[in-house]
């Protein structure tokens, strides 16, 4: 039995040798594992840095879509403000120009309708009395209707009376004191001699030949006239 136990236990020097070999082997394994651990740590560090950069990139990419629309909105608001300002300026200029042009536009007079049996022309109403009377009585009839024997102030009114009267002669409001005196209207304002009056008598009438003078007592038809009320309107 002692010999068998002795055979199983290695010699002391061999045991130490094995132990040293195991330690060296362990050290080699440890040294061989060391770089792997360091490499893993470096890889983990590199991976963390890459992830950090990727996260920052994503953060920037996430912010850019928000920043760009904000800048675009600001630009749009600025453009809108400029557009509105220009619109206001254009409207103001248009109004100013229209106001300046307004005095150049001739106003058209819109006259109220003349009363029944009266005819409107220009700013007057005319009544053609078909009953023959002398000049004085004809003037009285006109006054009863708040009018006077007819007066014309321009060639247009005279031509209207000549066209409308037909072929008959009509008393009008011209008269004078004598053949040497100037002609006047019934309100005693001077006649402007727009058309010469033929004859030497003191009372005027409208004939086919234009304006003529006749005796007061001759009976003729007559024309009354009076100013018409009106309101001025733009065309």
Curated annotation (Swiss-Prot):
Residues 1-75 are cytoplasmic. Residues 97-235 are extracellular. GO terms for molecular function: carbohydrate binding; natural killer cell lectin-like receptor binding. Signal peptide: none annotated. Keywords: Cell membrane, Glycoprotein, Lectin, Membrane, Receptor, Signal-anchor, Transmembrane, Transmembrane helix. It is found in: Cell membrane. It is a single-pass type II membrane protein. Residues 1-50 are annotated as: Disordered. Pfam families: Lectin_C. Residues 30-50 have a biased composition (Low complexity). SMART domains: CLECT. Glycans are attached at residue 134. GO terms for cellular component: external side of plasma membrane. The chain crosses the membrane at residues 76-96. Lectin-type cell surface receptor. This is C-type lectin domain family 2 member D-related protein. It comes from Rattus norvegicus (Rat).
């Amino acid at each position: 039995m002692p010999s068998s136990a002795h055979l199983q236990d290695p010699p002391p020097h061999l045991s130490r040798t094995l132990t040293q070999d195991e330690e060296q082997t362990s050290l080699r394994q440890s040294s061989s594992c060391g770089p792997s651990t360091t490499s893993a740590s470096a890889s983990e560090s590199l991976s963390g840095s890459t992830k950090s950069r990727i996260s920052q990139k994503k953060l920037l990419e996430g912010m850019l879509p928000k920043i760009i629309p904000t800048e675009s909105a600001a630009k749009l608001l600025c453009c809108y403000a400029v557009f509105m300002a220009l619109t206001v300026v254009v409207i103001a200029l248009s109004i100013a120009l229209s106001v300046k042009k307004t005095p150049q536009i001739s106003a058209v007079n819109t006259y109220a309708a003349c009363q029944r049996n009266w005819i409107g022309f220009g700013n007057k109403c005319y009544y053609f009395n078909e009953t023959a009377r002398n000049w004085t009585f004809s003037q009285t009839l006109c006054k009863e209707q708040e009018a006077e024997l007819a007066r014309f102030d321009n060639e247009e009114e005279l031509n209207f009376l000549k066209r409308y009267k037909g072929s008959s002669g009509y008393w009008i409001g011209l008269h004078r004191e004598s053949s040497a005196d100037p002609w006047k209207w019934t309100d005693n304002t001077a006649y402007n001699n727009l058309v010469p009056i033929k004859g030497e008598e003191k009372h005027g009438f409208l004939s086919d030949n234009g304006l003529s003078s006749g005796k007061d007592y001759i009976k003729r038809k007559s024309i009354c006239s009076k100013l018409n009320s009106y309101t001025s309107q733009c065309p």
